[in-house]
Amino acid sequence: MFVLSTARCTETRANKPTNHRRAEPDLTTSPRLLSSLLFSSLLSPLSTPRTRPSYNANAPSPSRTPMITLQSITDAVGLGSARYGGFQWSVALGWIGLVWYSTVTTVCALGYYKLWKHCLRRPQSSYCATAQNAPHVTVIRPVKGLEPHLYDCLASSFRQEYPRGKLTVCLCVSSRSDPAYATLEKLVADFPHVDARIYVEEEDPLLQPDHKPMYNLGPNPKIRNMSRAYREAKGDIVWIADCNVWVGKGVCGRMVDKLCGLGSGSSTEYKFVHHLPVAVDVTGVIGVDERRALETSGAARVKDGKSACAPGVLAMGGGRLEELFLSSSHAKMYTAINTVLIAPCIVGKSNMFRRSHLDYLTTTASCQFNPGIDYFSDNICEDHLIGDLLWKNRVREEKEDGKHLGKHALVFGDLAFQPIANMSVQSYIARRVRWLRVRKFIVMLATLVEPGTESILCSLYGAWGVTTVLAEYFQNKILSTWTTFFTFFGFSILTWCLIDWTVYIMLHSGKTVERDENTPSFARPPQGTTRRRFSHWLAAWLGREILAFPIWFWAIWGGMTVTWRDRQFRIGLDTKAHEIGGNSRAGLLEEQASGRENENEATSLITTAVKRQTRGNR
C-alpha cells in the first residue's frame, strides 16, 4: 500500500552521529495519513513520479546502509501538499462526508421538530365533519386475506365523523373464497346506515372472458381488486387505505379540509394528501380465535418467503423491526421531506386525491387501459407513481383557469396505525428488499444514497470529515487520530439512538388519537410509560441499524424479482412488473384453487373470531 523510494545510499562515517534519521510515520494514529497512502497505492501506476531514482555504479552496496523512506500520495503523484496549495484526496472526501453528515442531521432535526410539534397533542376538529356542503368521499379498501385486527381496521372507515350520505365505503377482494370475505359481509351487516358495498374482482364485468373487446388489465393484484370500485366511485374525492390500516374517527374530515383548503388552516388546495404510517407489533396480544384463523388462512406464514418453522426471535422478531423502522428513521425523514417538499415522498397506506385530476393526467390515446388507477396496473409501486404523476404535472384547473394548487400535503398529527403480528425476520427483510427493488428504477438516485442516511454509515462519514477536514483546518494533530475518529462515531451513534427513542415515545404516546370505546388497544396510550422497555427497544434498534446496509446491498445488487401477494414479479428497467410463471389470470385461478381446501374451516373460525371480537369491543 505504500510508495517506496530508495534514497541514494551513502556510507555512514563512524564519527558522525546516527540519531538524526527521519522518523517513520505512525499509521495507527492518523486516518488521514492512512487514506493518503491507500490512494497512493491505487493512483501511483497512473502517474509519473516527480523524480526517477538514480543509481550510482560507484555507490556502496545498498545492503550496507539502506535507508527506506515513505512518500504520501501527494509526493507520489506530484500533487503537492494541501498546506501549500496542493490537493489531497483524503481532505476532499472529508469535505464530502462532513457536508453529507451535516445535511442528513439537519433533515433529521427538522423531522424531529415537526413530530414534536404535532404528535403530542390532539388535532383540531375538522370543518367538514359538520358542514352540510361537504364533498362526497369514496373510501376504497383493498383486502387480501386475513390481517391482525382486520375488523377493527376496516370498521374505522365506517365510524368516521363525516356527514351521513357523503361517505361511501368500498371493500374490494379478489374472490368470494378469500378468507376475509366473511369479515367483509359482517361489516356491511353491522353498519347498515353506511353506504357500503363489497366488490369482487372475479365478478368485474370488464374482466370476464366473454367481454368484447377483452380488457387486458395489468398484473398488479391490488389495482385489479380496486379497478371496479374506482370506476364506479361516487363523487370526485377518492380515499385509498390499505385493509390493515386503522385511523381515528376524525381523520376523513381533516383530510378533506387539507385537500380542499377548508377550515381554519391554510386555504391552499392540494392535489394529493396522505398520512404518516406507524406499525405496532401485536404478536401475543391478539385473541386465540383470531390467531387460529390467521394460521389456518395462511396469513401468519411469511408472505414474502418461506414460513418460519420455529418460534423465537427469528420467527417473531420481524414485527419489532418493522415497528421500530416506521417509528424512528423513516418517520423523521418522511416528515422532513414532506415539510420542505423538495420531492414526492409517499407510502401508500392512506392517500386521498381527486378522480378528475388523475383521470385527466392518465387519458392518453396510446394507453390500452382506462384512465385512473388502471393506468398503473403494469406497475407494482402504484401509490408512489400516482403521487409522482400529480406532483410533476399540471391538471386542467392549473392549465386552463390559472388556479394555484399545492402538490402534496402530509396531514400532520393524524397517524395511519398498522397492527402486525407473527412477522419473522426473514419476512421483514423480504418486505424491505421488495420495496427497494421496486424503487431503484423509479427514484434511482434517492435509493442509491439511502444507506448514507442511516445512523452507522452517516456517522462514519461524519467521523471521517472531522478527522480530515477539521484536523487540516485547525492544524490539530489530536483531531487526526483514530481516538478522535471513534470518539466522534460513538457519540454520534449514541445521540442518534436517544433521539430515535424519543421519536418512538412520541409516536406511540396515543396523544393524537380521538379515543372512544371502539379504539383498539394498539392505538391507545401504553399502559406504562412506554410501549416497550428500553432494553427491548434497544435490541430491536441495533438489529435494524445493523441490517440496514446488507438489506440495501442485496436489494440493489441481488436481483430484480419480488414476491407480492403470493405472486412473483420481475421489475424491468421500464419500472413495469412482469409476472413470472404465467399471466395474471392464470395465477389468480391457481391461487383460488389452492385456497379452496381450507375455505370452510377458515370461514368458520373467522366468523367466530369476528363475533367474539365485536362483542369485546362493545
UniProtKB/Swiss-Prot annotation:
Gene Ontology molecular function, alphabetical: ceramide glucosyltransferase activity
Leader peptide range in chain numbering: none
InterPro entries assigned: Ceramide_glucosylTrfase, Nucleotide-diphossugar_trans
Organism: Emericella nidulans (strain FGSC A4 / ATCC 38163 / CBS 112.46 / NRRL 194 / M139) (Aspergillus nidulans)
Subcellular location: Golgi apparatus membrane
Sequence motif (Q/R)XXRW, location on chain: 431-435
Intervals of motif D1: 178
Source species taxonomy: Eukaryota, Fungi, Dikarya, Ascomycota, Pezizomycotina
GO terms under biological process: glucosylceramide biosynthetic process
Keyword Signal: no
Residues glycosylated per entry: 225, 422
Function: Catalyzes the final step in the biosynthesis of the membrane lipid glucosylceramide (GluCer), the transfer of glucose to ceramide. Glucosylceramides play important roles in growth, differentiation and pathogenicity. Plays an important role in conidiation and virulence.
UniProt keyword annotations, A-Z: Glycoprotein, Glycosyltransferase, Golgi apparatus, Membrane, Transferase, Transmembrane, Transmembrane helix, Virulence
Placement of sequence motif D2: 242
Residue numbers covered by motif D3: 383
Name listed for the protein in its UniProt record: Ceramide glucosyltransferase
Pathway named in the protein's UniProt entry: Lipid metabolism; sphingolipid metabolism
